[in-house]
Amino acid sequence: LNRFFPGNEDSNTTSRVDHRLWREIFSHSDHIIDLHSAALGRTNMPQIRVNLANRLSNRSARAFGTEVILDSEGPRGSLRRTADDAGISCITYEGGGADESDPEAIQIAMYGILNVLRSLKVIPGYPSRPRFRLLASGSVWLRSDYGGLLDVLTPAGSFIEEGELVATVTDPEYPGKSMEIRTPTQGLLICTATHPFVTTGTPIGHLLPIIKGLKTVRRRLDEEGLLVLSGADGDPPWREDDDIEDISVEGVWEGGSPDAEWGENPESAAEEEAEEADQI
């Protein structure tokens, strides 16, 4: 459904459903919060995806109250991009994985929704805020150069150092011999693969390279190096917005956009963007 908005009443079933949803519900909305888990075969640490150039969406993303915010337009046909093009505030929350119930991701989503409602004065109170925000305009996909059985050693939400071992891939034809996948830079691992079998080019993880604000981020790591997220241990306290440190994660979306399909070829994504540009 999230690749066919705003839909077409004369097209296939999925496009017709999207057309009805857009026409009857979403096009009349002022603010949209789109809740997602990761696709099959991966898991996401809680994060917000938003086009920060949209003033109202920017406000909702910050009000949601989670630490990781990815600044991107969203893929063509997604609800977020369609709403953004229509001038409607829309943010996407990603947390947890498919076919599972992640209590932490659900709790953070619940607090985030309440925060946005408070910021809009729909319900009483003030939105709770994290100690810092990572405002990312770039990331790195870690991909396997080998096919075989995958063993992920570092969970999503971990802060990892340059050269740290993230996963191994073992070819069943060569038992006892494993290929290592190490991170090219330090940063926060916001997504990892969960499927035990990979082929060449399969993404293993999604990394936010962090250079600025290292001391601030490290102070929020637990004993295992996992980022302790706002809302994970109960309703977080209210803070003045001036007390929050905004940390820029600059760069490009290396190896694919944050919203790219899990197995998408980076060249295909580039071709899609070029095709779109030609149509404008």
What kind of region is each of these model predictions?
Residues 1-280:
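Structured catalytic-domain cores with a bias toward divalent-metal coordination
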